From Swiss-Prot:
It comes from Bacillus licheniformis (strain ATCC 14580 / DSM 13 / JCM 2505 / CCUG 7422 / NBRC 12200 / NCIMB 9375 / NCTC 10341 / NRRL NRS-1264 / Gibson 46). Transmembrane segments: none annotated. Belongs to the alpha-acetolactate decarboxylase family. It is an enzyme of class 4 (lyase). This is Alpha-acetolactate decarboxylase. GO terms for molecular function: acetolactate decarboxylase activity. The keyword Nucleotide-binding does not apply. InterPro entries: Acetolactate_a_deCO2ase. It catalyses: (2S)-2-acetolactate + H(+) = (R)-acetoin + CO2. The gene is alsD. Converts acetolactate into acetoin. Its EC number is 4.1.1.5. The lineage of its organism: Bacteria, Bacillati, Bacillota, Bacilli, Bacillales.
Length: 253
């Protein structure tokens, strides 16, 4: 009589917990494709955490703990509605793998070097959350655009800039490897909201007073492209990608 063979039971990996769900591409925003087909009613199927923008560039998206907000060009935060639509966003289920405490004042440049030191590899994707007090946070939010849309490098020229000093709140966003630049924004891409959920925006400078950092490593990216004629007919080969993203997302000073 043959003995029954023992088979190792392999538990399936839940890919949703190990991925960045990427809606459209950064290069499409550079091209002025500001109307998408991703409704925020779908967002929680793909993440409880994320950043992005809204149709017509009408505000910045920030989300964590399953709560999503629209940060408009008046600098104020508004709860997201399911009927709101996004042409570009990055979502993830946030399950921290790394915890790190910052107990001293630290400017942006020093913090980014500290993060690169503790991240296992710069070739992976990471969702990043920073909760704490900031000596300063400088943000911007592009104003709502009207058709015919101009390229993003022109749209940001009139963006309102806000300086928040000695403020407590949360910065969230993603680290994207250089090889994925153009799909998302390579390096750190971060948005801010204060602890009262009243104000915030796209972050381009900050100085930490003290904060708790949580990092969620992601090994996969799920790219969802728009099913729109604007996207189908766009010519993405005409851009100086690195220069365009720096002009659109970097420090305007």
């Amino acid at each position: 009589m043959k003995s029954a063979s023992k088979q190792k039971i392999i538990q399936p990996v839940d890919k949703n917990l190990d991925q960045v769900y990427q809606v459209s591409t950064m290069v499409s925003l550079l091209d002025g494709i500001y109307d998408g087909d991703f409704y925020m009613s779908e967002a929680k199927e793909h993440g409880d955490f994320g950043i992005g923008t809204f149709n017509r560039l009408d505000g910045e998206l920030i989300g964590f703990d399953g709560e999503f907000y629209r940060l408009r060009s008046d600098g104020k935060a508004y709860p997201v509605q399911g009927s709101d639509c996004s042409p570009f966003c990055s979502l993830a289920f946030f399950r921290p793998d790394i915890y790190h405490e910052i107990k001293q004042r630290m400017p942006l440049e020093a913090f980014e070097e500290e993060m690169k030191r503790i991240m296992p590899s710069e070739n992976l994707f990471y969702a990043i959350r920073m909760d704490g007090t900031f000596k300063k946070v400088k943000t911007r939010t592009v104003e709502l655009q009207e058709k015919p849309y101009v390229p993003m490098v022109d749209a940001v020229k009139s963006q309102p800039i806000f300086d928040f000093n000695d403020i407590t709140g949360t910065i969230v966003g993603f680290w994207t490897p250089q090889y994925a630049n153009g799909i998302a924004v390579s390096g750190f891409h971060l948005h801010f909201i204060d602890e009262d959920r009243n104000v915030g925006g796209h972050v381009f400078d900050y100085e930490i007073e003290e904060c708790t950092v949580q990092i969620s490593q992601k090994l996969n990216m799920n790219l969802r492209l728009p099913n729109t004629q604007d996207f189908f007919q766009a010519d993405f080969n005409k851009h100086d990608l690195a220069a365009g993203i720096e002009a659109a997302e970097g420090n305007p000073e």
